[in-house]
């Protein structure tokens, strides 16, 4: 079977709370339209025919997920997440030990476009390392002085990218790199950083800048605008 036709599993770490949203409800359970942010994020993955299973890592005390239609979806598996994102991803990887390639997608990134997902999945044909969706930095970037709200210097943006999700890697490689990085006390901010720590260089697959992560209150209205626009375009 050609590599481009291999089935793919996805892991969605959804055990976080997201205190920057300034709400009592975890951000992944806030609603946009008639769905939660988590549902929008997961349905975007399931819309691709290669994605056959999604593992969602939730907090052990989470009582909200069971109320969603996702809880009874035949392609959804739920596992207990950990205190950190990497712990939740590892728990998800353990649940899909049979998978060769795995997507990892943010629970609060609901605006994923199918053409971006298709381009990312296509790299499995020729890559042994995988890659991530990313968007080139377009704004002027400043580095601040340590401990001060003052500019230290301007950062050259020519080779800077915003890391997005999904991120897409061979399952065994990602599992081994995450495990090693955690055991050695490395700072892991996303899955690609674990591979970087172990000496690998994942590909950058340019994706749309409107694939935003809902982190702050103002992001919710922006995500709603992007999703509404996409729905209208699909109906046109």
Curated annotation (Swiss-Prot):
InterPro entries: IspD, IspD/TarI, IspD/TarI_cytidylyltransf_bact, ISPD_synthase_CS, Nucleotide-diphossugar_trans. The record marks 20, 27 as: Transition state stabilizer. Pathway: Isoprenoid biosynthesis; isopentenyl diphosphate biosynthesis via DXP pathway; isopentenyl diphosphate from 1-deoxy-D-xylulose 5-phosphate: step 2/6. It catalyses: 2-C-methyl-D-erythritol 4-phosphate + CTP + H(+) = 4-CDP-2-C-methyl-D-erythritol + diphosphate. Keywords: Isoprene biosynthesis, Nucleotidyltransferase, Transferase. GO terms for biological process: isopentenyl diphosphate biosynthetic process, methylerythritol 4-phosphate pathway. GO terms for molecular function: 2-C-methyl-D-erythritol 4-phosphate cytidylyltransferase activity. Its EC number is 2.7.7.60. The record marks 157, 213 as: Positions MEP for the nucleophilic attack. Homodimer. Belongs to the IspD/TarI cytidylyltransferase family. IspD subfamily. Catalyzes the formation of 4-diphosphocytidyl-2-C-methyl-D-erythritol from CTP and 2-C-methyl-D-erythritol 4-phosphate (MEP). This is 2-C-methyl-D-erythritol 4-phosphate cytidylyltransferase.
């Amino acid at each position: 079977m050609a590599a481009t036709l291999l089935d793919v599993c996805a892991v969605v770490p959804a055990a976080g709370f997201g205190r920057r949203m300034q709400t009592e409800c975890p951000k992944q359970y806030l609603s946009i339209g008639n769905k939660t942010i988590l549902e929008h994020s997961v349905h975007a993955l399931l819309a691709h025919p290669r994605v056959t299973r999604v593992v969602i890592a939730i907090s052990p005390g989470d009582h909200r997920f069971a109320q969603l239609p996702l809880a009874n979806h035949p392609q959804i598996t739920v596992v207990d997440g950990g205190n950190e994102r990497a712990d939740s991803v590892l728990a998800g990887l353990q649940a899909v030990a049979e998978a060769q390639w795995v997507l990892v997608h943010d629970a609060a990134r609901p605006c994923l476009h199918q053409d971006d997902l298709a381009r990312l999945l296509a790299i499995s044909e020729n890559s042994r390392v995988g890659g991530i969706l990313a968007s080139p930095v377009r704004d002027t970037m400043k580095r601040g002085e340590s401990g001060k709200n003052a500019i230290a210097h301007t950062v050259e943006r020519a080779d800077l990218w915003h890391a997005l999700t999904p991120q897409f890697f061979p399952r065994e490689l990602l599992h081994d790199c995450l495990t090693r990085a955690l055991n050695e006390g490395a700072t892991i901010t996303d899955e690609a950083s674990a591979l970087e720590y172990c000496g690998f260089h994942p590909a950058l697959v340019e994706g749309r800048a409107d694939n935003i992560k809902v982190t702050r209150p103002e992001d919710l209205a922006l995500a709603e605008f992007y999703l509404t626009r996409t729905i209208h375009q699909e109906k046109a």
